[in-house]
Amino acid sequence: MAKKITGYVKLQVPAGAANPSPPIGPALGQRGLNIMEFCKAFNAKTAQIEKGTPIPVIITAYQDRSFTFEMKQPPVSFFLKKAAGLKIGKKPASGSKTPGKGAPAGKVTEAQIREIAEKKMPDLNCDSVDAAVAMIRGSARAMGLEITG
């Protein structure tokens, strides 16, 4: 018989930097999950990924207080900022203050967008790489990035 699922927890955790402080501790504590066990497992799985890369993770909580977790690719905005050479981090915001008007925040090439689309393909809700490229182009425009060649 399969374990009974009691819920899901969605978090975005920096690679190799999971610790019991907020937001991880309270989110897992509410479900009665072992926080340190998750932190150790997550940090071990993300050891080969560049430190500080934001990793979306979906934790499945079971009735017996055990859990499993699934990691996704970093957000598109992270890849776009990296490709454009912008500062990566939450504050200060490194996108354009007024996207579509005035000076662009940075530049990305079509080749970089295609590369990002191929990396993100498993996580995106689309069937073809061309559709993924269109989604990422839209994200780049919304961030105030100029798309070249």
Swiss-Prot record:
Part of the ribosomal stalk of the 50S ribosomal subunit. Interacts with L10 and the large rRNA to form the base of the stalk. L10 forms an elongated spine to which L12 dimers bind in a sequential fashion forming a multimeric L10(L12)X complex. Belongs to the universal ribosomal protein uL11 family. The keyword NADP does not apply. This is Large ribosomal subunit protein uL11. It comes from Methylobacterium nodulans (strain LMG 21967 / CNCM I-2342 / ORS 2060). SMART domains: RL11. HAMAP family: Ribosomal_uL11 (MF_00736). Forms part of the ribosomal stalk which helps the ribosome interact with GTP-bound translation factors. The keyword RNA-binding applies. GO terms for cellular component: cytosolic large ribosomal subunit.
